[in-house]
């Protein structure tokens, strides 16, 4: 526990100290910044804001985790666990970095195409499974204490879980500070679970990432001076999925990650309903003012027809939802 606290403090200090230099470098080199969605007019002023800040906090968290773990790793099993989680973080971070690089440095608005990104994510998921999950012999899902054996189909579950939540966190990263603190809330919850399970190696990784994210948040809260980019959001989503698998509490991510699930579901529902109504009535109709869900809240509150919410209001609401959901999971696991 002491080493986890040390890792968190070091990560916070290095991340908070390094980020201004990253932002200044970005501005001095006059690198193109984040593109804004024209439908949310209050976001247009953010155009050109430095992005790819996730590069900094990922490097910091990874380096600190490896450094501090040298004093805590006692066996090869612990080393395999740490390397497994860090590997998926690095792989998905590289995918996100490539996507950001194409958008910003090569001026390719789309970045990686959807098919290219999915192919790379699946390849990363396969590497994670065959190098770190399969050797452990895990082939079942723990659902409320019951082991649901999937056999070879556990491979498809892992791919769905990692790819799905990496994209879900990516969708959540749409307004200042939302994704960074939402992930911190999720990581704190998994930190409690790891502590109860005496999985101190996982706890150390969690602590390092929490510290690095809080250092990043010092510059990502409204008005944001930097965004994490796909390099950060894709890696964070994959990390949450990997941690839920490592702790054998996969189902909990559906509740702990309720904000990411809500954001993704809103997009899927909107697209499906629009296509259905266009085919049936000749015109596409919408359920939400705009998706992902945080934009719906910005444009008209919960109903979509009320007063516009500020980014701080949206943040507070969704952070609150995530916190309550996380407390519910802890209550289910350790109280009821």
Curated annotation (Swiss-Prot):
Main localization of the protein described in the UniProt heading: membrane
Keyword Transferase belongs to the record: yes
Gene Ontology terms: cellular component: plasma membrane
Keywords assigned: Cell cycle, Cell division, Cell membrane, Cell shape, Cell wall biogenesis/degradation, Magnesium, Membrane, Metal-binding, Peptidoglycan synthesis, Transferase, Transmembrane, Transmembrane helix
Residue ranges of the TM segments: 3-23, 53-73, 78-98, 118-138, 143-163, 174-194, 200-220, 226-246, 251-271, 316-336
GO MF, one example: metal ion binding
Pfam families (UniProt xref): Glycos_transf_4 (PF00953), MraY_sig1 (PF10555)
Reactions it catalyzes: UDP-N-acetyl-alpha-D-muramoyl-L-alanyl-gamma-D-glutamyl-L-lysyl-D-alanyl-D-alanine + di-trans,octa-cis-undecaprenyl phosphate = Mur2Ac(oyl-L-Ala-gamma-D-Glu-L-Lys-D-Ala-D-Ala)-di-trans,octa-cis-undecaprenyl diphosphate + UMP
Pathway, per record: Cell wall biogenesis; peptidoglycan biosynthesis
EC number: 2.7.8.13
Stated name of the protein: Phospho-N-acetylmuramoyl-pentapeptide-transferase
